[in-house]
Structures are given as C-alpha cells and as structure tokens.
A protein has these predicted regions:
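Rossmann-fold NAD(P)-binding glycine/threonine-rich loop
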Residues: 1-15
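Aromatic/hydrophobic pocket-lining residues that form π-stacking "cages" and hydrophobic walls in ligand
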Residues: 5, 31, 239
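Predominantly a Rossmann-like dinucleotide-binding segment in NAD(P)-dependent oxidoreductases
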Residues: 14-17, 22-104, 109-111, 247
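Hydrophobic residues in well-ordered beta-strands that form the structural core
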Residues: 16-18, 123, 150
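C-terminal glycine/acidic-rich active-site capping loop/insertion
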Residues: 21, 115, 138-228
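Glycine-rich, aromatic-lined ligand/substrate-binding cores of catalytic
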Residues: 87, 99-101, 109-110, 115-120, ...
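Glycine-rich phosphate/pyrophosphate-binding beta-alpha loops
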Residues: 124-132
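Terminal low-complexity tails and localization/encapsulation signals of metabolic enzymes
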Residues: 213, 248-253
Length: 253
C-alpha cells in the first residue's frame, strides 16, 4: 500500500512527505549526519522500551489491537537507519514475546536487519507495566571511523521516564568518538560532546513537519530518496513481524 501511494504521488507530480517526526528533529538530523561520516559498514543499535501504567498502558493496549510495538515504534528508528546507510535492506530476522494476557499480540519484539553495503541494524521495542527501564533508550551507531551515541541521563542525574512521550525523541547530548590512533595505538582525538539542551519540544517538532511540507512544495524539493526510505523502513518492520510469526528469516527482493 505504501509503495502504491508513493507511485501515485510520482505519477501525479505531487509532494509526499513521510510523517516521521525524527526526520525534522534538529538533533536527530545531526545524529544522522554524524553517522554518515563514520564510514561503512555501520552497526546501528536502537531501542525504546516503555514501562507503561495508567493512561499510557491503556494507549498501548489500544495500539496493540492493530500493531505490535516493533512495527508501530520500530518503523521510526529503522527509518533513521535507512537514512544513515543510504543502502538497500536485504534480510530481516525478528523475534518477539507476549508478556501479558491483556493483549492478543506480542508486546515485546526485536529485529535484526542487514543492508547491501554490509551494514547491520538492531531495534527493540516493548510496552507494558512489566518492562524494565534499564537501558530502555539506546541510540548508538558504530563505523570504521568511530561512533556516535545519543546520551540520556544516567543514575544519579535527572531521571527520564520511559513512558514520557517527549523523552522518546529527546537527545540531551550526542557523544562522538573517533577511532583514529597514533603509532603508539593511543587515541588521537578526545571524545566530543554536543549539547542538545535547547532542542524543540514535541509540538514544535510537529510544527516543523508542516513547515517542511510547505517548503517541499514551494521550493520543489526532490523527495525521491525521502519517500523510498519511508517505504523501505515499513518493509523492514513488516518483514520483522512476518519473521516473528513464521520463525523464518525474511529476504527482501
């Protein structure tokens, strides 16, 4: 269905913007830009587990009437992976578990995806009152030239709740590491910290999506790669769910 919509937009000469909020988030755009400079292949590790209770658990149960977390949540981070690699996904393996009787589907899942440039990605998503908040927000990319990570508050600092919607895209800081070493096998560069404390809130990011659509129309921006990444990310998470359901690795044509 997504591919059909993209094809229709191309045929009609219309602008189609994929509604993934991370695409217009300044800090995430910088995260992607830094990852693209790490060389190939890339190793991409991203998760978002949400320990939900009260209203958030009601929202999650409602969502799981039609989608699993690895599809609903995972598609955003897999889309980031597609932008980082610029490569074609070729193989997906998914695994999941049903940790509650309150839903008919698995409320936990993770996937592994391979790209045709040798890059690999891992994504994990789980929802519910049983989920751990240990390492619930991992956003980490490694390449031959180093690594870049999104760093969130650690123990002893300001606590970030896993079911806080605003925290799902919040970066706090980027940690950039260079792998360059000298003749004594010592690192040449110190790690670089990029503070992202002034990033826009959730509503401001939604506003940026609308602004980008208007810009795409007014400036006739070529959205070919933008749309293809959106289709590829959806293909990956749907393939992951198929893999979970069948127990088989899914190869993408």
């Amino acid at each position: 269905d997504a591919q059909e919509i993209v094809d229709m937009a191309k045929a009609a000469g219309k602008k189609l913007v994929i509604g993934y909020i991370l695409r217009v988030h300044p800090a995430w755009m910088e995260f992607i830009r830094r990852a693209q400079g790490l060389g190939k292949p890339l190793v991409m590790r991203m998760n978002l587990n949400q320990q939900s209770s009260g209203d958030p658990w009601i929202w999650h149960r409602n969502l799981m009437q039609s989608l699993t977390p690895i599809v609903d949540c995972g598609v955003h981070y897999v889309d980031v992976m597609c932008q980082m690699t610029g490569a074609k996904p070729v193989k997906v393996h998914g695994m999941g578990a049903k940790l509650t009787d309150a839903t008919k589907v698995q409320n936990y899942g993770h996937l592994h995806v391979e790209f045709d440039d040798g890059s690999v990605g891992w994504n994990e998503a789980g929802w519910g009152p049983m989920m751990s908040e240990t390492a619930f927000f991992v956003k980490d990319v490694v390449g031959p030239k180093g690594s870049v990570s999104i760093v969130v508050p650690q123990d002893g600092e300001t606590h970030t709740s896993s079911d806080d919607i605003d925290s799902h895209t919040k970066t706090n800081a980027l940690l950039c590491h260079s792998s360059e070493i000298d003749e004594n096998n010592q690192f040449v560069h110190e790690d670089e910290w990029i503070n992202m404390a002034d990033e826009p809130d959730h509503q401001a990011r939604c506003d940026r999506e609308q602004e980008y659509l208007l810009k795409a129309i007014n400036e006739d921006i070529d959205l070919t790669e933008h749309m293809q990444n959106g289709v590829d990310s959806l293909r990956i998470v749907i393939a992951a769910q198929e893999s979970i359901d069948t127990g088989e690795i899914v190869r993408l044509d």
